[in-house]
Amino acid sequence: MRPDAASLRQIEASDPGVSTWLSANAGSGKTRVLTDRVARLLLNGTAPAHILCLTYTKAAATEMQNRLFQRLGEWAMLADDRLRAELAKLGLDESPDDEALRRARRLFAHAIETPGGLRIQTIHSFCASLLRRFPLESGVSPNFVELDDRAAALLREEVIEDMAAGSNPLAVARLAALATDQTMPVLAAEIARNRLAMTRPLTDPGDCRALFGLPRGETMAGLLGRTVLPGDAALVADLIPLLRAGSAADQGAADRLAGLALDAPDAEALRALEGVLLYGKTAKAGPYAAKIDAFPTKATRAALGEPRLAALEGLMRRVEAARPLRLSLLAADRTEALHAFAAAFLPEYDRRKEARGALDFDDLIARARHLLTKSDVAQWVLYRLDGGIDHLLVDEAQDTSPDQWAVIRLLTEEFTAGLGARDERRTIFVVGDVKQSIYSFQGADVSTFAAMRADYAGRLAAADDRLAQMTLEHSFRSSQTILDLVDRSLDEPARAQMGDPFRHIAFRDRMPGRVELWPPILPGESAKPENWYDPVDLVSAEDPVARLAREVARRIRALLDEGARIPTPDGSRPLHAGDVLILVRRRSPLFSEIIRACKAERLPIAGADRLKLGAELAVRDLGSLVAFLVTPEDDLALAEALRSPLFALSEGDLFDLAQGRPGTLWDALLAQADRHPRVLAVLHDLRAQTDFLRPFDLVERALTRHEGRARLLARLGPEAEDGIDELLSQALAYERSDVPSLTGFLSWLHTDDVEVKRQGESGGQVVRVMTVHGAKGLEAPLVILPDTADYAPPDRELLLRLDGGPMIWKPRADDAPPAVAAAQAARAAAQERESLRLMYVALTRAQSWLIVAAAGKLKSETSDAPNGRPAWYDRIRAGMEAAGARPDGDGGLVLRDEAW
């Protein structure tokens, strides 16, 4: 049977004799192409050790390896005719003879027996193996350990504390004066992550000032002296009583001016003057222009008199002119403090890691890159590798960072030089999709994808070779209705920001599809809290978010109860809970409310896809118990433990214990031993073991011997199991890294907020709720997107790299000096482009049914939105209208095939 067009395209892309750069749409079967290409390389006689496949995640590497071993295992057991048919599907030019069949059957054993096995691994795993293979050349211990994010964070904090205590207190104090206790660890992490950009720190004040366009010798004192003249303090003093007699706006200005000491002004006084004398960012007169003829009000200006009004306008103009200089000076001071700290911190951080024989994830890439570029050993290392790598495959190339690309490029130098250790033809295969690049926060740079494609094409052409550039347009996942919506929701300006031109074709063109757009739930008046003691961030039942969550849960319940059917390639079947995937952009209140609403409807639900260990109730209950065991005088910890499912005392029981007690809560509990015998039996046993058991053993004793796990799960549900298990894992990790003690374990837990990724439930019949990032690579028959209202993701990065320049400490958007504004605008534009790509990923998870909803502000022609760009909801609505969607009778739209 002749292959269809989609399969022919996959066969062409998997040709092992041609270097290929493949752009693959969502659902187009790129993993199949990768697996086919490796299988064809093995069939051609390439040794497994000469193939290297680099993936983005360990999960992707595992999936690909499992698929490949499954296929090779099946080949080993198939009869001749069936094996010939399977090999024909790979696109082999000739029918395989008996020897080829025997070779295919031996591939499974050959791959299993190869030392090291098939090399399908992440770039970090490869770099780690490279460093272990050449420890002397790379200058690392052959037995180095890899620091996970948590251990690295703890080590950085240890370095900062020791620097502050003795080795370099001035650098820490200077940075701490400009930062907070929350931003210091983040700054240290970003400095470590961007160490290559910090290798030549800007510690010279002149360099920092030149970076921000400041004249040499410019200082804050000089600027203040030129801006606030000797007579200005008296001028403002005369102005204040006139303002107090004026309008409400004048009176507010008087209050702000009254607290200023203009006889000896500082930078904060100048900032306060700007707030009174200058317009804001969006004024018609211009951003931060002087309020000439607008301040004070007309009556107050008349009372002020012409001479003093002229003096006031002169002060306004000087403050206007001083603002960019003030911002530049502050930015220069912050950046100088940043680089002074980095110059002291990075060497000490590296020294501590070396003393422990440890490397963090960034070290793996940096050290491997350095090893492959060292003039004295690089050629030797490349020669040895050249004898080991003939074919390099790169998966998810759009999410590969520039530093990782540098390593990949060095590995393939000989591929494009026409020379090498052997005469075998070498190839590189790269697959990715710019439209799905959504991990910039992990270092991915979408522009590098096109740059490296051009680089390889040029280098191969220079070596009389070629790079085949192909695109997979057929989707094996989604119906044509879904794909048409994807194409139409991205207008021409949006498509231009997504990279190369694209289109989507459904492989199963007859499979029906359906898209629903629910009417948005817009914000109304804020509901007043029902009880004064409710938390300030409690979501009201009438909040748009809560209302939408209930609507989503009710709709799923109704679909399941009425036996709704979904189309499949083999015909329709009843919908079950496992067919439903709910995707949100972030773990906001909507995320939690949807889970709560689904539980209220008694829907089988997997819970959150990720959990923060410190926020889990079961973990907090166990933490309170441990805190009490460490310090019996800690009444709050004991009260929390008693009210938890571990002991299940009621509010009344706790009140009877605590009210009017003369001593500690523990003393009160001992005095009422006859009322709570089980509680005291458990606590006495655990207290007796506190000085003898390690943290893991003590927590496990509470969970198993005293039935703590069963009690927690009975009260909190099975999803609490992940948090409990991770707490035990953290106890073991702590014991491996330090001398175990309960006090140290509590400190370990509270130092960093551990995030745990739950195992996917794609094979179970439960509703899944997760972020779009977490759903990358997943699919579902019914996808619900409730989080499509306007949202401007915050820029959480504290460092900013100027175009072609060094790293600076990013100021707030409103405080950006001219030299920084362009870089910040470029970053904001890049974030908007990534938002479009995130929407693309969300839409393309759906196989046949998509529901879109929104709660909150939208961006339309007549409304304002925080980021000034269309919300996802508006883009999708425009796409549905362009595709011919019809009103559903409830204020929404529906787009569906006639066969639905």
Describe the function of each predicted region.
Residues 1-66, 70, 142, 146-150, ...:
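Conserved motor-region signature of P-loop NTPase helicases/translocases
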Residues 34, 95-102, 129-135, 316-320, ...:
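Active-site-adjacent bridging/hinge elements
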Residues 120-127, 338-390, 403-407, 411, ...:
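Conserved helicase/translocase P-loop NTPase motor core
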Residues 682-687, 828-843:
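Phosphate-interacting basic helix/loop segments used at nucleotide- and nucleic-acid interfaces
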